[in-house]
């Protein structure tokens, strides 16, 4: 391995770690303040992955060249508008979108929305114009960190390390690692976060803690927002949110005259009205005056490419379909890159049925669950053999990747595949790799604060509890320390509270309006009663989830569902 070279962790993770090769070993960089010399277990697992060594066509091993010919011929003989380009987030380097450039020019259908952060992102955009996190220094300079629907110490372990001595408050139905480290844990009922945000705003007003200067000079609609908070008697929130008023008082006492940060995660927005819910939380933050202070602020999964011009983008008139609702069977050819929709997309049964009825190309580093349904598998080169730049959705530092290992035979990078196809079809060429990488390396985005905050002024959210029967369970999913979405060490259990009446190792059948699947039970006090918890990557969970788009952002809403559980 070449020494003194950079390696960016390619994985979909807030931390976007920078590594470097030292004496033939890959080590976390000490110069990157977030990475701070350490990498995680998932990085170690990534290095040990059994990457594809040959291409596969109709279950037979073939060479890379043969696979590229089959792909070109198939694309030439298929109507472009009957093809779909589907990109997952297995590698988040900027060079990954080279192929999207080709498929845009070719005329494929593309996807819109997200399986991840789309709803919440839209909510922030509606209030502040763009989804941008404050500089990480402001998090480090705060006194109190409210962790809202995010498993902060697990899903961004490096960001957590920078602030681990702060006082934490966690709002989560599950007793997560960070909840156990918190001074207050509000074990909230699922999909009631907007109610808690309204209640907290009401208490903020009752205790004269609102930021009058911000409300007068930097915002619009605060009175309308405050009106919504007054719609209901204060005590009625206790039953619906499951959060005692005493804890609400405790939180406000804790934050009074303190520098406050709120780190919001996916958990609050895996629902139909995810954007409205996020906007309520951001509005509470605005009301309390968390924005525009020297320290503190609100963090979410920011738009990591904000302020950069996409060097691989090309304008096209391509049709776009919601990624949550993709019907793979309606295309003659489906090209899947860096994704594993058989496990990660909602409604596994319809995903599999769809894939069985289309010509499926998987462009991937490893033979994943989706490859089982592929006609053609093209091996992507390892991240160690690709030049790239990794931007972060957690903080403002970028990571750089040089080539530290020669690409394995019969593998190809995303950039080279795109270049090859573009030349085959005589399309407009890509910029050179040097030019693209230099642009991202040399461009610094200066943080600009939003001008004015727009409060949410109307609310229309249908709570899940309204339709929940006493035998129903809420579906909750969250990331695991030992896996990265569907990659690495997968846990297929359903986790239930002891009050569920089930016991360890029970075989249960779980049913939802969208499908059913069998699971083995693990009992845990950490799970709130009436919740069924599954780690992300569980091979069965998405048999239960709706392949429908949320209200406004075309994104998935994995938790907009109620479950029935019985012994099987
Ligand atoms: N180790 C590891 N790290 C990862 C990943 C991984 O797979 N493994 N995945 C990466 C990716 S792709 C992403 S997007 C990020 C996401 O990272 P996070 O934002 O932390 O997302 P999740 O773990 O999905 O969910 C966060 C929390 O929301 C809680 N929750 C669920 N429903 C509700 C609710 O209604 N209200 C509230 N208040 N909380 C709720 C869950 O219990 C969970 O603890 O993590 C990244 N980092
Ligand atoms: N029920 C439920 N479902 C969820 C979630 C949840 O919390 N609960 N989380 C959602 C979230 S936040 C996300 S982000 C999505 C993630 O969903 P996906 O984007 O589908 O991610 P993975 O399932 O991890 O699959 C990534 C694949 O990319 C491949 N890969 C890795 N590196 C490269 C590379 O360099 N090049 C190429 N071509 N391929 C590569 C790997 O082999 C791996 O199989 O899942 C979503 N699905
Ligand atoms: S913490 Fe995240 S970015 Fe850092 S090495 Fe692990 S997976 Fe990669
Ligand atoms: Mo994600």
Where are these regions (language model features)?
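N-terminal export/assembly segments and adjacent metallocofactor-ligating motifs
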Residues: 1-206, 221, 244, 337, ...
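Generic, well-ordered alpha-helical scaffold segments in large soluble proteins
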Residues: 70, 74, 105, 148, ...
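Short gly/ser/thr-rich secondary-structure transition/capping motifs
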Residues: 124-132, 317-321, 359-362
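A cross-kingdom feature strongest in bacterial/archaeal respiratory oxidoreductases
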Residues: 5-9, 141-181, 189, 320-408, ...
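A glycine-rich, hydrophobic/aromatic-adjacent loop/helix-cap motif
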Residues: 255-328, 390-394
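N-terminal leader/propeptide and maturation segments of large enzyme subunits in energy/redox metabolism
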Residues: 207-244, 405-452, 510-513
């Amino acid at each position: 391995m070449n020494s003194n070279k950079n390696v960016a962790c390619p994985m979909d993770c807030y931390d976007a770690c920078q590594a470097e090769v030292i004496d033939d070993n890959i080590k976390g960089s000490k110069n990157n303040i977030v990475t701070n010399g350490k990498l995680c277990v998932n990085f170690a697992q990534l290095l040990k992955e059994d990457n594809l060594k040959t291409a596969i066509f109709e279950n037979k091993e073939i060479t890379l060249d043969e696979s590229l010919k089959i792909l070109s011929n198939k694309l030439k003989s298929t109507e472009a508008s009957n093809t779909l380009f589907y990109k997952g987030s297995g590698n988040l380097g900027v060079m990954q979108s080279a192929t999207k450039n080709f498929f845009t020019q070719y005329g494929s259908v593309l996807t819109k929305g997200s399986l991840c952060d789309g709803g919440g992102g839209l909510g922030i955009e509606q209030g502040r114009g763009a989804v941008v996190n404050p500089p990480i220094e402001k998090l480090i300079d705060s006194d109190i960190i409210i962790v809202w629907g995010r498993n902060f110490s697990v899903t961004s372990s490096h960001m957590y390390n920078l602030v681990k001595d702060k006082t934490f408050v966690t709002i989560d139905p599950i007793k997560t690692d960070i909840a156990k480290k918190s001074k207050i844990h509000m074990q909230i009922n699922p999909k009631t976060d907007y109610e808690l945000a309204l209640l907290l705003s009401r208490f903020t007003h009752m205790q004269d803690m609102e930021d009058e200067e911000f409300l007068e000079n930097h915002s619009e609609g605060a009175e309308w927002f405050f009106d919504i908070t007054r719609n209901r008697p204060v005590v009625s929130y206790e039953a619906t949110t499951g959060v005692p008023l005493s804890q609400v008082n405790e939180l406000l006492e804790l934050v009074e005259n303190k520098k406050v940060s709120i780190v919001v995660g996916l958990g609050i927005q895996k629902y139909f009205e995810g954007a409205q819910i996020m906007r309520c939380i951001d509005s509470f933050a605005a009301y309390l005056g968390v924005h525009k202070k020297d320290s503190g602020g609100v963090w979410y999964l920011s738009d990591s490419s904000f302020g950069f011009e996409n060097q691989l983008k090309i304008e096209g008139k391509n049709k776009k379909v919601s990624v949550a609702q993709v019907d793979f069977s309606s295309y003659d050819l489906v090209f899947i890159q860096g994704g594993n929709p058989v496990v990660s997309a909602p409604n596994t049964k319809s995903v599999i049925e769809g894939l069985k009825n289309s010509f499926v190309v998987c462009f991937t580093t490893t033979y994943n669950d989706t490859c089982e349904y592929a006609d053609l598998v093209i091996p992507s080169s390892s991240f160690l053999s690709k030049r790239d730049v990794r931007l972060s959705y957690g903080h403002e530092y970028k990571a750089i990747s040089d080539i530290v290992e020669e690409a394995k035979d019969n593998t190809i990078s995303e950039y080279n595949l795109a270049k090859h196809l573009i030349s085959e079809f005589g399309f407009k060429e890509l910029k050179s790799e040097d030019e693209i990488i230099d642009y991202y390396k040399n461009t610094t985005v200066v943080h600009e604060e939003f001008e004015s905050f727009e409060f949410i002024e109307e609310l229309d959210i249908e709570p899940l509890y309204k339709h929940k029967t006493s035998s129903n369970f809420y579906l909750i999913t969250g990331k695991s320390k030992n896996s990265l979405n569907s990659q690495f060490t997968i846990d297929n259990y359903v986790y239930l509270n002891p009050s569920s009446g089930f016991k360890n190792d029970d075989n249960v059948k779980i049913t939802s309006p969208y499908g059913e699947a069998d699971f083995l039970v693990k009992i845990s006090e950490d799970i709130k009663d009436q919740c069924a918890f599954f780690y992300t990557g569980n091979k069965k969970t998405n048999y239960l989830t709706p392949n429908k788009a949320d209200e406004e952002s075309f994104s998935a809403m994995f938790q907009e569902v109620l479950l029935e559980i019985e012994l099987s």
